[in-house]
Structure formats: C-alpha cells, structure tokens
C-alpha cells in the first residue's frame, strides 16, 4: 500500500495550511467567545473546501476523501471549531444528499452547500 500523498493533495494541504494560519488563527479568540465564523466559512466555500468531496457537476471540488481528511487536519491544527464545522457539514449535511438524495435534491441543495452559502448541520 502506498501511503504517500499525491501532488494535488500536497498542494491542497499547503493551501489549507496557509489559509488556516492567515485567516482563521486571527479569529480564534472571537470564536472562543461564541462568535460563529460565517466569513471564514464563506471564504472556505470560495476555496472549494465546503464542497471538497462534492463532484464538480454539483459545484464541488470533486476531490477524494484523503484530501478531505488532510483539510480537516490542517484546519483543526489552528481551530478545532472550524475543523468540526467542516466535518459535520460534509458528513452530516452534504454526503447524505450526495449519496442518497434524488437528482432533484442534489440539484437544489448540493451547490449552495458546496459553495458555503448554506451550512450542513445536525
């Protein structure tokens, strides 16, 4: 089994690491006081992170689950809050629609979720 990351995964890791350090780290104290990171999530949507595993046909980045885990790891290094938000958004909000939704539901919900315009939650 080859456990090395692909070039694409390494580039994505570096991008997420820079984003977390530059954009999330300065906001951590506010989040710890209860401020929800809406602007950060919108920026994550612009970067393709909110739809990292969603196919491009539905507005996502179309990346694999290894990339998704790398992204969560890099985000969580700076803020567990943001890492958990992405995890829940993807695993509870987006993936059930992607895997079990009708085509009509996919068309209606996946693009706004993938773009970070809607947030998936419990």
Residues covered by each model-derived region:
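Intrinsic disorder at enzyme termini
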Residues: 1-8
